[in-house]
């Protein structure tokens, strides 16, 4: 069994968590999360929308909101809005919740 190193991409805050993500826009299929990059310490995400006019960011936020069962208004891009490497603030989600949810989807 692989170690749960994806936990390194999640940081706990008082108000929620910060998640480091690497996005591949314009993919054939939507996959949130799609894997973990252990060198960059980022959870990987594949989006079907292209990175034009914020469409991929919109899909990322909507997909994460659905994954965690929260409102998309509780998710903010704290850095990397125009980059494939992003950090997102997710309010109202604990570190333990995030590990459980991502872990369930990342176990191979």
Swiss-Prot record:
Coiled-coil annotated residue ranges, if any: none
Name of this protein: UPF0235 protein MM_0822
SMART domains for the chain: DUF167
InterPro entries: DUF167, YggU-like_sf
Pfam families (alphabetical): DUF167
Organism: Methanosarcina mazei (strain ATCC BAA-159 / DSM 3647 / Goe1 / Go1 / JCM 11833 / OCM 88) (Methanosarcina frisia)
Family from the record: Belongs to the UPF0235 family.
């Amino acid at each position: 069994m692989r170690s749960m190193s994806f936990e390194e991409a999640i940081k706990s805050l008082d108000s929620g968590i910060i998640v480091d993500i690497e996005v591949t826009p314009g993919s054939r299929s939507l996959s949130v999360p799609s894997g973990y990059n252990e060198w960059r310490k980022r959870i990987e995400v594949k989006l079907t929308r292209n990175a034009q006019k914020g469409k991929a960011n919109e899909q990322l936020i909507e997909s994460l909101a659905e994954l965690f069962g929260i409102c998309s208004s509780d998710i903010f891009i704290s850095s990397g809005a125009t980059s494939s490497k992003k950090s997102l603030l997710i309010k109202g989600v604990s570190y333990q919740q995030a590990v459980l949810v991502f872990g369930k989807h990342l176990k191979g």
